[in-house]
Amino acid sequence: MKNYGAEIKSHRENLGISQLELSKRTGISHQNINRWESGTTLPNIAFCVKLADFYGVSLDELIGRENRS
């Protein structure tokens, strides 16, 4: 199974921001971000869309989905 939390974390780290900063900028709780990145829980689609928009990537890119051509 794909590690979606690692993908979310990678995008955050590429911007050079902390979980707390991501929380402040997106309005998503720090606890949720921590749980997703640690693999404890998965974000629902609404949060995925919010993160993808913030990072400026597609949903496929956010979760590390590769092109299936």
Locations of regions flagged by a protein language model:
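A short, Lys/Arg-rich alpha-helix, primarily the initiator
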Residues: 1-14
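Residue-level detection of the helix-turn-helix DNA-binding "recognition helix"
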Residues: 13, 27, 38-40, 67
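Alpha-helical residues within the helix-turn-helix
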Residues: 13, 24, 53
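Short alpha-helical DNA-recognition segment
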Residues: 16-35
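DNA major-groove recognition helix of helix-turn-helix/homeodomain DNA-binding modules
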Residues: 46-61
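Phosphate-coordinating loops and pocket residues in cytosolic domains that bind phosphorylated ligands
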Residues: 64
